Amino acid sequence: MNLYVLNPAGCYDFHIAGNYLKDRRPNETVYYMHSSSVPVPEFNNSGRMVVRCYGENDITTALGAGAWVASAAELCRLVASIDGDHIVPDVISPQAVKLMTQEMPDHQFSLGWNFTPRNRPWIRTGSLVGTSALVLRYPDGECWVFITNTSTWKGHKFSQDTMALFEKLRKRFGSKMPKRNMFIN
């Protein structure tokens, strides 16, 4: 992944997360649980009780299913490198972009995205204990990312609320945003 996709895209600070606070990478946040959260059994059946965001799941084996750690800026750069827009050169073929972004029937995910409707934002959501994320790539090329370092108990409502916030912010401030390639090397 690093050799063929991330590094050619200019993304050098993506890493597979560790399972415990001691495994935290430089530049990685600390994850938090809600005050009502209770300790849970460690993923490896050790009998130890752990904080859910540090030891409930074996993150290192999740790989593409949520183990990656990256900043919002790095995620935007990756999206710009796989979106089929030639402002930032793509690191995947036009055929791969087309495959990943073809609109799917209701309740079916696109390849790598949750949804890729025509003339609306492409959507990718994700959550694990201790984090939630939302990535929107708009038809005008803007990419908006929101990442938390705590779990939300709102379920899918978290993404809906965040998308509504993004729309309000785009309407209010969109004309004030710079209209330029933010990833010029």
Which ranges hold each PLM region?
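Short, surface-exposed loop or secondary-structure junction motifs
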Residues: 1-121
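Gly/Ser/Thr-rich beta-alpha loop segments that engage phosphate groups in nucleotides
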Residues: 66-68, 128, 132
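Extracellular/periplasmic catalytic domains that process cell-envelope and extracellular macromolecules
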Residues: 104-107, 127-129, 136-140
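Short Gly/Pro-enriched loop/turn and capping motifs at secondary-structure junctions
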Residues: 118-120, 128-130, 151-153
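Hydrophobic residues embedded in beta-strands of well-ordered beta-sheets
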Residues: 120-122, 142-143
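Short, well-ordered beta-strand elements
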Residues: 132-137, 142-154
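Short, gly/Ser/Thr-rich active-site loops of penicillin-recognizing serine hydrolases
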Residues: 153-185
